[in-house]
């Protein structure tokens, strides 16, 4: 069984049962309220364990640190998925917590726990992709299955077996997928027992699943550039479509742990008229490891997270091997950058501290990009305005900030 380290750099077998919440009438989950949902993480000294907390607040305060007194404790480095006013918390490391559904009430600005879906221990349910109001895909990283559930009732309605697509072991390690034109594109990380890509399988594999039939139509692979580990199971923005509906997938490679292989970057599945004609286009792939980060002397050793801004621009966290001092799990080796897919440039964003590999969240708040940071001297959320190039701290937190959403 793989006890994967995906969630500390990004993320992070067996029958499945499900049940409704034990309480017939849902009750508010905590006393906190507000229109901003924030998750923070307190790491133990080894960087491999700790505690995470989810809470609402109205106070974006860069002076007084947000504590966890009115927070819900969630599994360490758990995932959070939001659809409208539905909030899903997933146990991305273990699985015993399962998938918890919360409902946000805009009138009271509070969260109420609604229902729970039980998953096997160590199955690693990292993300939930809604197909419709009554159907969602729940890929399991450590089990070679994609569960199909009804997100309204939180009941299982089916499953897709993907074991046959695994390389050298029992699970192909499902990543974070995306739906385009009625098909679910599901990247497979294909990691070995050492938590790294197989040396004889340095490529990116993606399953194409018909969302009407739940059948795998085909598997496609990008083998030219040797970019591996496509997507991160807990990060929605690591896979995206451009204005032309081309799918780009972030590839972390060896997370910078292998000095002999720092290949990382992006692979592309262009828009196509038919599934049979759908393939990767290696001419649109980009290995960023040889590109100097403008404003520094470093080149990326891996890429942690990404947020597509439009017109070929991406806000991202990349790592520099030169910043690894003692423990790569807690070293401040993450650099906030602006990537241009068209010009093939990477530029450091000034004003955002270097962070560790846990706190590398990137999201949006209106026209601003929000970065979650756990720096040497500052922790919290930092905003970046792509139009002006101005960045600033908008929230001070006691723990490292690794999720943000504005209702």
Where is each model-derived feature located?
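Beta-propeller blade signature
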Residues: 53-55, 150, 199-214, 262-274, ...
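Post-signal peptide N-terminal segment of secreted/secretory-pathway proteins
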Residues: 55-148
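Beta-propeller fold detector
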Residues: 63-72, 110-118, 156-164, 216-224, ...
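Short, conserved, GDST-rich strand-edge loop motifs in beta-rich repeat architectures
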Residues: 186-203, 249-263, 316-331
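Bacterial Sec-dependent N-terminal signal peptides
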Residues: 1-38
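Loop/turn-rich, solvent-exposed surfaces of beta-rich toroidal or solenoidal domains
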Residues: 299-367, 371
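Short glycine/acidic-enriched loop and turn motifs that connect beta-strands
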Residues: 43-47, 93-97, 142-145, 191-195, ...
């Amino acid at each position: 069984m793989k006890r994967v380290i995906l969630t500390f750099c990004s993320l992070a077998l067996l029958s499945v049962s499900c049940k409704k919440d034990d309480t017939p009438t849902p009750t508010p989950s905590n006393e906190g309220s507000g229109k901003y949902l924030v998750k923070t993480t307190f790491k133990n000294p080894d960087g491999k364990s700790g505690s995470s907390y989810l809470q609402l607040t109205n106070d974006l305060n860069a002076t007084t640190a947000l504590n966890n007194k009115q927070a819900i404790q969630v599994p360490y480095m758990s995932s959070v998925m939001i659809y409208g006013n539905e909030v899903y918390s997933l146990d991305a490391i273990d699985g015993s917590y399962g998938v918890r559904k919360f409902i946000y009430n805009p009138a009271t600005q509070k969260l109420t726990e609604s229902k729970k879906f039980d998953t096997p221990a160590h199955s690693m349910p990292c993300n939930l992709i809604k197909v419709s109001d009554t159907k969602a895909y729940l890929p399991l990283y450590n089990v070679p299955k994609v569960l199909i559930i009804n997100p309204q009732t939180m009941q299982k309605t089916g499953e897709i077996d993907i074991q046959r697509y695994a390389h050298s072991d029992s699970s192909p390690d499902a990543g974070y997928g995306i739906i385009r034109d009625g098909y679910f594109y599901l990247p497979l990380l294909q990691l070995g027992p050492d938590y790294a890509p197989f040396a004889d399988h340095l490529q990116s594999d993606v399953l194409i699943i018909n969302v009407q039939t739940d059948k795998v139509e085909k598997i496609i692979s990008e083998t030219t550039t040797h970019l591996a580990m496509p997507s991160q199971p807990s990060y929605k923005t690591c896979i995206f479509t451009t204005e032309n509906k081309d799918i780009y997938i972030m590839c972390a490679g060896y997370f910078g742990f292998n000095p002999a292989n720092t290949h990382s970057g992006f692979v592309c599945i262009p828009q196509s008229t038919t599934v049979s004609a759908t393939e990767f286009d290696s001419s649109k792939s980009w290995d960023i490891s040889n590109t100097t980060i403008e404003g520094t002397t470093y080149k990326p050793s891996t890429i942690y997270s990404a947020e597509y801004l439009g017109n070929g621009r991406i806000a991202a966290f990349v790592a520099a091997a030169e910043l690894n001092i003692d423990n790569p799990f807690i070293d401040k080796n993450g650099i906030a950058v602006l990537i241009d897919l068209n010009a093939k440039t990477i530029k450091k964003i000034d004003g955002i501290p270097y962070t560790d590999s846990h706190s590398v969240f990137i999201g949006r708040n209106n026209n601003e990009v929000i970065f979650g940071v756990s720096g040497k001297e500052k922790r919290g959320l930092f905003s970046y305005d792509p139009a002006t190039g101005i960045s600033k701290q908008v929230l001070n937190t006691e723990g490292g900030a690794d999720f943000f959403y504005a209702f």
